[in-house]
Amino acid sequence: MNKYRLSDETRLWHWQNGETKSVTPLRQIIATTDFNDVLCGTKGGWVEDERALAQDGQCWIYDENSVVFAGATISGNARLTLPCMVSHHAHISGNCWLDGAEVSHGARISDNVTIQNSSVRGDCHIYGNARVLHNSMIIAAKGLTPDQEQILKIYDNATVSQSRVVHQAQIYGEAIVNYAFIEHRAEVFDKAILEGNDLNNVWVCDCAKVYGNARLIAGFDEDAIPTVRYSSQVAENAVVEGNCVIKHHVLIGGQAWLRGGPIMIDDKVVIQGRARISGNVLIEHQVEITDDAVIEAFDGESIHLRGEKVVNGESRITRTPLLGAL
């Protein structure tokens, strides 16, 4: 037994893909039986044809300003509330909830996912109990990295809010991403927290990874943007705060704490233990900082450490060492 019929009335939906303008006739869904919280006779959104909304399951398009077209499908128990646009072979299934969302161009949304006031575009899969909230933009694109087949994924219990996630990035576990920009093949997972604000985002790019209980926290001053790039990793209980740029093959772990600025760490540097780094500091070329070591540049001064050396124990450095002093 069908749960809805299509209206005799049609509505022309004008849309544009690149420079190509198109018009698609849509028809409104009208419930023909009571199911879930939908009463017989209730009018819903507009679809291109019956393939857009499954006749079985509890799925429904609640808002009369929602549209589903261009090969997109809604199935299972999925719900669309507030005006939503689902198009271009996007597939919404399971117990998903779309609320004021736009999903298109091959995106797959399944399981118990929530997409609220956000857009998802491109060949990606968002599943599990993941949430994408508060004007986030998910823009998937394959082929921009050496891995031609990897697709963007957000899954498990990950939450993305006020953020942009693009290319082939991966966010999963219990990760919380707020006011951040994640691109290329970057990964954020476990219980990592990225906490930007309305002035400064957190950036994780290239093949960088943030995981464990690590935290990246943006400040409110100009350029107080924590940035992790290339193949660098921030892990365990490390905290990176403010104007910090982490570049090539850097590992920050333990309970290390970095507060810029600005701080730049580059080229196979390892920072772990309970190390503390703050102020205007440049560390590069295979330096290891561990234990309770402190690198602290006072206001108006800067520190530059480079070359193969280990700073450990309770060492405290407040100025650039003389050549050969370490």
Language-model regions, residue ranges each:
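Terminal amphipathic alpha-helical/low-complexity segments used for targeting or macromolecular assembly
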Residues: 1-58, 64, 77, 89, ...
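Repeated polar recognition positions within modular binding domains
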Residues: 62, 69-70, 81, 97
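A detector of tandem-repeat and repeat-rich interaction/domain scaffolds
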Residues: 71-79, 83-84, 89
